[in-house]
């Protein structure tokens, strides 16, 4: 049984008789009292899809739920559902747009390394790769010779995500984006 301080994003835990997926974790250290850190977790109920906010002490013991990750690819959008196809047996997995709203910003038809998270034979979420390559659809014109400066400008990506990029990057460039920090990592290798 792991401690609350060991739980990571996209983990599945059992709490109060429910299976919950961890969507976000915020660590806080209360001032003026003895004791450890507090971990505020935004959780999603696997069955109802409802949001649950819980706070745990660092030493609280939690149970992992039985979960598996299936390598998949984004296939198509069907109304309010995103459909992913299993890379091995071509099983389609339907996920509600709301339950994967944060991850949608990093997914296009070419995104590789996606895993569908399965709990009790039902898809409950997706795990993204550490970085993805996305196309810049709109940004200010590039400035020649600006590669040495550390100034940045906003850039709109093909998925609707806006990130800060160096001034020498222009519209139409493909860039690598860190999915955890939502930050520019560099130009994508052109092949």
Swiss-Prot record:
<dbReference type="InterPro" id="IPR012340">
    <property type="entry name" value="NA-bd_OB-fold"/>
</dbReference>
<comment type="similarity">
    <text>Belongs to the elongation factor P family.</text>
</comment>
<dbReference type="Pfam" id="PF08207">
    <property type="entry name" value="EFP_N"/>
</dbReference>
<dbReference type="Pfam" id="PF09285">
    <property type="entry name" value="Elong-fact-P_C"/>
</dbReference>
<dbReference type="InterPro" id="IPR011897">
    <property type="entry name" value="Transl_elong_p-like_YeiP"/>
</dbReference>
<dbReference type="GO" id="GO:0043043">
    <property type="term" value="P:peptide biosynthetic process"/>
</dbReference>
<dbReference type="InterPro" id="IPR001059">
    <property type="entry name" value="Transl_elong_P/YeiP_cen"/>
</dbReference>
<dbReference type="InterPro" id="IPR008991">
    <property type="entry name" value="Translation_prot_SH3-like_sf"/>
</dbReference>
<dbReference type="GO" id="GO:0003746">
    <property type="term" value="F:translation elongation factor activity"/>
</dbReference>
<dbReference type="InterPro" id="IPR013185">
    <property type="entry name" value="Transl_elong_KOW-like"/>
</dbReference>
<dbReference type="Pfam" id="PF01132">
    <property type="entry name" value="EFP"/>
</dbReference>
<dbReference type="GO" id="GO:0005737">
    <property type="term" value="C:cytoplasm"/>
</dbReference>
<dbReference type="InterPro" id="IPR020599">
    <property type="entry name" value="Transl_elong_fac_P/YeiP"/>
</dbReference>
<dbReference type="InterPro" id="IPR015365">
    <property type="entry name" value="Elong-fact-P_C"/>
</dbReference>
<protein>
    <recommendedName>
        <fullName>Elongation factor P-like protein</fullName>
    </recommendedName>
</protein>
<dbReference type="InterPro" id="IPR013852">
    <property type="entry name" value="Transl_elong_P/YeiP_CS"/>
</dbReference>
<dbReference type="InterPro" id="IPR014722">
    <property type="entry name" value="Rib_uL2_dom2"/>
</dbReference>
């Amino acid at each position: 049984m792991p401690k609350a301080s060991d739980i990571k994003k996209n983990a599945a835990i059992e709490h109060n008789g429910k299976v919950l997926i961890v969507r976000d974790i915020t660590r806080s250290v209360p001032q003026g009292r003895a004791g450890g850190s507090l971990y505020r977790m935004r959780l999603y109920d696997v069955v109802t899809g409802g949001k649950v906010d819980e706070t745990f002490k660092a030493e609280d013991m939690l149970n992992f739920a039985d979960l598996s990750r299936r390598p998949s690819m984004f296939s198509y959008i069907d109304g309010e559902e995103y459909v992913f196809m299993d890379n091995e047996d071509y099983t389609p997995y339907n996920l509600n747009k709301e339950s994967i709203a944060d991850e949608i910003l990093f997914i296009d038809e070419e995104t590789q390394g996606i895993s569908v998270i399965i709990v009790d034979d039902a898809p409950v979420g997706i795990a993204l790769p550490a970085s993805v390559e996305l196309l810049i659809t709109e940004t200010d014109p590039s400035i020649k010779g600006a590669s040495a400066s550390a100034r940045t400008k906003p850039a709109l990506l093909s998925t609707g995500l806006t990130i800060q990029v160096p001034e020498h990057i222009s519209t139409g460039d493909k860039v690598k984006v860190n999915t955890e920090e939502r930050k520019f990592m560099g130009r994508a290798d052109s092949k």
